[in-house]
Amino acid sequence: ASCGIAYAMRYVRAAVEGGVDLGGSGMIAEKIVLQTVKGAVELLQANGNHPEAEIDKVTTPGGVTIKGLNEMEHAGFTSAVIRGLKAGLK
């Protein structure tokens, strides 16, 4: 559905903005984010694992990944995505 594409693009936009906020150039940040999203999709398509199983493979206790994921969850990432999906159906 086109709304799903827009939601995914909103994540891409936010991640690019984050890269710029960290001091990178917009063009480089966009290339990194697009390759990251492409890699995640290809990984899930190739092995059929649940996304959480793949997240667990790249997450270590106290590491950068878990710290970032925890911050996103504390800010309501999953809830915001679910609420957005539901709002689109009202």
Residue spans for each PLM region:
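NAD(P)-dependent Rossmann-like dehydrogenase/reductase catalytic/cofactor-binding core
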Residues: E30-K90
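Membrane-interface starts of transmembrane alpha-helices
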Residues: S25-A29
